[in-house]
């Protein structure tokens, strides 16, 4: 029985109670309406054995391969990153928290990397933590429902401060069910985007009255936004929030005291965010993604800025819908800026209203200017986009469509509010919306008459919205808007049976859970999917992967890091021995002469590598060299390569002197996970196949040893002669120090709150 709907209802009821207790205007009937709309949108995943993920994408790769399935006929291939990245990371985070362990380290991909530092894992997201009691598949839907409810409720609260109830509901619907949320529903981007109205609401509240409670809530929004897992969207959010605060302070003449308060809030928010932000900043420069962008940043024109790519801002389904034929740029990156046709028309209506009344300091003028600014960047108008691109050089700024949709939703509420009193804004809005529809209908090129007919049919729901607006019955407009968004975006996240979400197969069940690593050749058991089954893979499909590790694979195996779906192709590579790979998964029929066949079935083959090395072992010889160019010529079974040896001169001579094959060797005996007994006849370098990152702590009989980077990308350490117990632990100071800073900040805030009179500023 799927009671996710009931669990979400209980959480939402508690949230509504807190909002009402804070004396914010949220009528119970409005909250009930929002919950009912979300249940309608997610009905089957909330109530039955379903999940709204394109799980049939898994049928493209072994061991789930199905005949006749291609990326062109699966339900929505655009969401493949969910199945191959985000869902496995989510399950790892959940498993770690359920074991009462902070999800700091991912040992199941690429010989290990920091999991929490990969912000897209959302290791500290409040929504992820709230969904922990639910099974994995149901938790996915619960998080989606909470994002929608958060976006709907806070958008309503923000709009309600200026507009009547029905316009505020319409604005909430335009944002909460718009493509900015729905297209990225299961992505971290939507988690951060859902907090957009909250940030703007808190700026309003602090501008109105500065109280202890409002200060504290605003400060905690910082870590909540960062924990959402998309730094790029968080940075864009902060940029527009700063503009909004400046507008209130200067254009609305509310004084600079607000800016001082917001600066203090930002400082406290940064301190509270330390355990989230510090690990990310510590590891970011060492990742393959960052190192790639250092060489080749997002230069040149803003992507997706041509007319076909801008067309989905007016109608997302204009070029077709999945899994049907697509004849234009109907991809997630172009489709995430739609908040209903009125959002476009409202810009023209509110502009006419401001000009007619000659009132240019009102809040609606900020919405006009912010939306125009975002559009000029998306449209790549150089005078605006070039400086912005220089400021956000590492960001994909075409994703400002999300902020554009947010402002469009707010303008929808403003238009519905003003049209009750004046006709000019309504007529200007209808004219502007019709003009946009005519432009995309007449200036786009269609491959055939059928495609053109489909495109024109997609404009009918928008026409119905405009007809409803003509009646000036605002409730009818809100209903038509919801229907328009349903037709435009509801099918984007297809509903599939829950049993299709990473199902067990005979091949998966045949793999021993012995602790040694696996590798899949080609697309077999695609990287990250292994994590769902608790299997450690040496492959990576992750922008946070270790840059040096990727470089090593490129040097020694011909791995192509520029291939988005980079594959391991050589099942006979001796590097597999060093990487502790015992199990090799292949597609059906693949032959590996060096390895022993353990399983052969229609879902693939499983081989055992009998020459695998342990995770930790003693290197017989040590080579000190300033670079790793000689690595392809070195037998990593017997020789370790280092750039530095931070030991005494005598120990260095001992380590670097050649050791014949007949010389006694050190013995490394594992006693527990990452714990071992080392018996060394002389100074010995113990090497591992665990990726080297900041944060490793090594002790020998309780005494600290310095972690070394060996063989280009791995962890090693030097032990003295004799016997001793070694413990290796990942204890990043960036996290634990950051957590201490955050806790100290909370203590100071509590003390300050206790000494503050109720209601004081």
Regions found by a protein language model. Name each.
Residues 7-12, 118-124, 138-153, 335-350, ...:
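Hydrophobic alpha-helical transmembrane segments
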Residues 1-32, 188, 194, 202, ...:
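Contiguous transmembrane helix-bundle modules in multi-pass membrane proteins
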């Amino acid at each position: 029985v799927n009671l996710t709907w009931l669990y979400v209802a209980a959480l939402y009821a508690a949230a509504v109670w807190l909002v009402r207790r804070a004396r914010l205007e949220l009528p119970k009937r409005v909250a009930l309406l929002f919950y009912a709309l979300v249940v309608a949108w997610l009905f089957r995943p909330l109530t039955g054995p379903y999940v709204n993920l394109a799980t049939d994408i898994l049928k493209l790769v072994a061991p789930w391969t199905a005949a006749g399935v291609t990326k062109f006929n699966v339900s929505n291939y655009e969401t493949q990153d969910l199945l191959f990245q985000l869902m496995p990371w989510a399950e790892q985070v959940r498993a770690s928290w359920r074991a009462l362990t902070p999800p700091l380290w991912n040992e199941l991909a690429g010989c290990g990397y920091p999991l929490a530092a990969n912000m897209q894992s959302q290791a500290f997201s409040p929504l992820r933590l709230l969904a922990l009691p639910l099974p994995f598949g149901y938790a996915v839907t619960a998080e989606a429902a909470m994002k929608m409810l958060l976006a709907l409720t806070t958008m309503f609260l923000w709009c309600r401060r200026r507009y009547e109830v029905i316009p505020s509901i319409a604005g909430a619907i335009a944002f909460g069910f718009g493509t900015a949320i729905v297209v990225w529903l299961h992505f971290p981007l939507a988690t951060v985007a859902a907090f957009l109205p909250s940030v703007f609401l808190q700026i309003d509240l602090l501008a109105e009255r500065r109280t202890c409670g409002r200060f504290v809530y605003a400060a905690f929004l910082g870590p909540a936004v960062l924990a959402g897992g998309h730094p790029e969207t968080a940075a864009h959010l902060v940029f527009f929030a700063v503009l909004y605060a400046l507008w209130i302070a200067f254009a609305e003449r509310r004084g600079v005291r607000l800016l001082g308060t917001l600066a203090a809030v930002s400082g406290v928010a940064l301190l509270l965010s330390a355990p989230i932000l510090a690990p990310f900043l510590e590891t970011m420069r060492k990742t393959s993604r960052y190192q790639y962008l250092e060489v080749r940043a997002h230069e040149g024109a803003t992507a997706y800025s041509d007319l076909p790519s801008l067309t989905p801002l007016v109608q997302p389904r204009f070029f077709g819908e999945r899994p049907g034929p697509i004849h234009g740029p109907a991809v997630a990156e172009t489709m995430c800026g739609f908040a209903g046709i009125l959002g476009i028309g409202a810009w023209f209506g509110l502009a006419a209203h401001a000009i007619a009344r000659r009132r240019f300091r009102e809040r609606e003028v900020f919405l006009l200017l912010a939306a125009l600014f975002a559009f000029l960047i998306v449209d790549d108008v150089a005078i605006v986009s070039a400086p912005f691109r220089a400021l956000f050089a590492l960001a994909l700024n075409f994703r400002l469509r999300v902020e554009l949709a947010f402002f469009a939703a707010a303008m929808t509420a403003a238009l519905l509010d003003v049209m009750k009193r004046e006709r000019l804004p309504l007529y200007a809005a209808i004219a502007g919306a019709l003009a946009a529809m005519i432009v995309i209908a007449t200036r786009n090129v269609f491959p055939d008459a059928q495609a053109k007919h489909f495109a024109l049919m997609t404009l009918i729901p928008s026409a119905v919205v405009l007809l409803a607006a003509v009646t000036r019955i605002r409730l009818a407009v809100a209903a038509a808007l919801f229907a328009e968004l349903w037709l435009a975006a509801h099918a984007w996240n297809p509903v599939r049976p829950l049993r299709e979400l990473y199902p067990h197969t005979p091949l998966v069940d045949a793999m021993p859970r012995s602790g040694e690593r696996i590798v899949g050749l080609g697309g077999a058991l695609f990287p990250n999917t292994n994590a769902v089954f608790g299997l450690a893979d040496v492959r990576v499909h992750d922008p946070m992967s270790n840059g040096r590790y990727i470089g090593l694979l490129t040097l020694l195996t011909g791995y192509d890091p520029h291939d988005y779906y980079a594959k391991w192709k050589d099942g006979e590579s001796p590097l597999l021995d060093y990487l502790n790979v015992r199990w090799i998964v292949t597609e059906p029929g693949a032959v590996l002469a060096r390895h022993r066949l353990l399983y052969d079935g229609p879902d693939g083959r499983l081989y055992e590598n009998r020459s695998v090395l342990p995770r930790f072992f003693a290197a017989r010889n040590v080579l000190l060299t300033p670079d790793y160019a000689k690595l392809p010529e070195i037998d990593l079974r017997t020789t370790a390569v280092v750039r530095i040896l931070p030991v005494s001169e005598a120990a260095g001579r001992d380590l670097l002197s050649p050791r014949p094959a007949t010389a006694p060797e050190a013995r490394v005996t594992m006693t527990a996970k990452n714990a071992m007994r080392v018996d060394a006849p002389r100074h010995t370098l113990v090497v591992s196949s665990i990726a080297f990152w900041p944060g490793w702590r090594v002790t020998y009989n309780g005494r600290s040893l310095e972690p070394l980077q060996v063989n280009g990308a791995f962890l090693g350490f030097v032990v003295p002669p004799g016997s001793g117990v070694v413990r290796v632990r990942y204890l990043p100071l960036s996290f634990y120090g950051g957590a201490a800073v955050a806790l100290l900040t909370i203590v100071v805030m509590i003390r300050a709150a206790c000494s503050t009179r109720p209601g004081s500023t």
